[in-house]
């Protein structure tokens, strides 16, 4: 057996505590699978007096980040403090000191992946990040290794457990958005400020990472078209169910090379190429109406799932807990085992992530992405309103697939919900139509719309 692999853990909160526990409680198993001992040498924390797992020897705990990074007995630095400021400095300093890095920091990779990976290549060291996307679901390894013979043509994923918990509660228990969010916060699925979860930002960070691995595309999270779940009303849940659909917050990537059938026609949601002939990939995070029979429609609660389409293998699904102490720790320790075996070093060198050697894809402009749309309007109940709306849609070459309008109350006078499902249309044209509809003066509230997943 070769020398011990020394580990410094920077951050020992929920996930860091889980990593320390797994390394110490299952040391024999991990040694067997890594082919060498994985020894926890340092644990860096903000508050050394905070109670910790009794398996962590007190002498390992300190507040000295630099001491941990430059300790000659440390070969790997595990960054689990999150965010961009201190975490980025820790990662770059560790690489400069000749240490491998394991991180679960999606924001760091999505925003500064190019800088981090260039530093790793200069230092001839490895960055592992399985836990940065979908927690305990091994989708990074699947894309980088198991599907290496494929060109991924599309990804559809539920990457935020908080949003999926809220939508599940609304669909299955008839809860309002506000009530479902409050329950998610009470159970610890949502933060006191849930903005990053419910507005799609968290999922956009993760999609940016998946897009880099799958297509070689470097897309900043703010460059990804994004729509959150906070505009979804109980009315939308009911109408979707009536139409045979469930609403899910999806992170999606579509290439022009991916098509699917609907009503016997082959359709592509992403453009084939840009003006220079370079193939494009459409990236967006938004609520999507999925048929009840779709695989992702059946993912419940706080679980994550990633559906990957490869040009050789076809459709593969990866599902499991997307967050939490032990699921995330499982992925972090798996990266450490890969480093111990030497597998991670070989795959890192071959992958060339966040480098100039991309795979020839560019990001599709959001307005060119094609979709069917669900449109809900609160309209005044008087003659001519529907005719005005359909005329505007026709002006933008948007045809109607179906329409749902329940009878108005007997007293009349108040707005009534009108739901329109369109055929495929370009997002830019659809948004122009919405702007005109909202200016008609016959709607009681701004239009609500979502993409259809078929």
Task: Specify the residue positions occupied by each region the protein language model found.
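Glycine-rich phosphate/pyrophosphate-binding beta-alpha loops
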Residues: 292, 316, 320-326
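Substrate-binding/catalytic subdomain of NAD(P)-dependent oxidoreductase enzymes
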Residues: 179-258, 277-298, 303-305
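A conserved regulatory-domain signal marking ACT and ACT-like small-molecule sensing domains
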Residues: 274, 331, 336-454
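N-terminal glycine-/serine-/threonine-rich beta1-alpha1-beta2 phosphate-ribose binding loop
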Residues: 1-97
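A short hydrophobic/small-residue beta-strand
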Residues: 100-102, 400
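Rossmann-like NAD(P)H-binding beta-loop-alpha module
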Residues: 121-202, 209
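General beta-strand structural signal in soluble alpha/beta enzymes
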Residues: 62-63, 78-79, 102-104, 127-131, ...
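Rossmann-fold NAD(P)-binding glycine/threonine-rich loop
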Residues: 87-97, 106-144
